[in-house]
């Protein structure tokens, strides 16, 4: 510019100056910049002579050779500044080379020397129809304000692909491949003297004469790795609007780090990755500081900062102007599925307090700039869908207390697992003297028991059908998965379960053992002691003598002192008691005997061969029966019998034990000793 800007007249004059002198930095003669610059309609003196305000001085070489006539005609003072509209945007961070699935081999070429070809892919946004073409080893030319790129060979370009308007569109052209190994090493990068760009992505708006010449250009270079592979890196981006070429610069603080990989988020926790203003820490940042290009202030704090200081809060450099960038969207209807966003509402409510809100068109609302460009700032984790089992199958899953959202595998918990669960969780469930259950602390909703402790029997009711049970628990017939939420209610939307919980389904008997096992698994899950209320007695599963010797050390942890005042269940071959083979019990040495009106637990502590967990019953203590989820008796559920080792087990420590659901009719053919059940 130099001598040209010092002329007093504003007329256009043809000056014969070589294009490579004044419009290249550093110029061969004269000065590139004047002693002042104009920004926001104001005139400022240049503090740094020959210094580019918005980037490195070398970036000026990407602007091209005199795209328009110069000097510019000064606009009238009363004419407002016209905002340029960018119709196409290529997300340069998504530009990449993808290796083709099959290597291209020439005839007679060895397999080790096969050439590797790549596809070029990237993501772009467009508000109009656009035609995209990729050029290699191309030079740039401007003719009548229209940018064109000419490759050194006609084969070094792709076919033109048409796209409609849309956001987050993926450019992928499998028919077009590129092999950077065919070029010389100096051709992989950009050389200012040669003025040849290794890669040019040219996106031209195809919307008629109104936007004639409007285009977006992405310049890139290639790099070769040590293993012989290649990658592409973006160099610069340009926008041509109304015959003028604009160089796009980065805005610091506009990236959304919430959508990056988890590892990167963990590394950047200490960095400034929030969307709030760095001064007030409440409003959303929407004001850009120039010339340092830090997006770190809200409109209110930026207006205050103009009269208090003239330094950027981030880099402490003096700023010359403030640029507010606001994104707007149509207001969502009341029936819109989009959830309420507090950041959007806060920005909208705050903007109404300022006069700048008058520029908002009717029917639109202000949205965070970060959210408009990158989507939601804090996306909610995806909830896994409900897995529908077969008809009549009920799966009891316990609430998840961790971050693992995967469902546990379908398995049966062995007694070794139950013992480890009880010791790890530290749950020592003792027999309680209370006769009622609190509605707030119970996992299942129960009615308050008004029977006294002296009662020995309670009238038993029939268990409802599986379909009726699902209806009472709020489960639709289409999805019969039941989830026990941590709040105590049955939550169908929560689909996560702890790895220790059991999900059991039997194809032969729909309700044979799944409900009973899921109820027993509650004792070994992560449930606090206030969620499991008083029970009547304890059921100790029989085992072998070897197991009793191996597990004799943690005996005090599994024993609970019996207390007086408990109900005495009557002896009856009913579903209230589980049948135990007399032979196995005698071999174990358990002193469990039949009593007419005796307590199921002797005075003192009970010794068992296999140390299971003693739990309290969720029902009142004079009933030793299993109840359904609606507090009704499950007459169809067979209570667990003896522990049986799996045939496929390799060792005692690796055995997976299961509960054999024995039929009640088998109890008549073999000698059994009836004992109370505890789950």
UniProtKB/Swiss-Prot annotation:
Keyword Translocase in annotation: no
Enzyme superclass (EC): transferase
Source species of the chain: Homo sapiens (Human)
PTM per Swiss-Prot/TrEMBL: Phosphorylation at Ser-660, Ser-661, Ser-662 and Ser-663 downstream of the PI3K and MAPK pathways influences the E3 ligase activity and stability of RNF157 during the cell cycle in an anaphase-promoting complex/cyclosome-CDH1-dependent manner.
Chain intervals with Polar residues compositional bias: 339-349, 478-537
Domain remark text: The D-box motifs play a key role in RNF157 stabilization.
Role summary: E3 ubiquitin ligase that ubiquitinates APBB1 for its degradation by the proteasome and thus prevents apoptosis and promotes survival of neurons. Has a dual role in neurons as it is also required for dendrite growth and maintenance for which its ligase activity is not critical. May act as a scaffold molecule to regulate this process. Acts as a downstream effector of the interconnected PI3K and MAPK signaling pathways and thus participates in the regulation of the cell cycle.
The keyword ATP-binding belongs to this UniProt entry's keyword annotation: no
Positions where lipid (N-myristoyl glycine) attaches: 2
Gene behind this protein: RNF157
Name of this protein: E3 ubiquitin ligase RNF157
GO biological process: negative regulation of apoptotic process; positive regulation of dendrite extension; protein ubiquitination
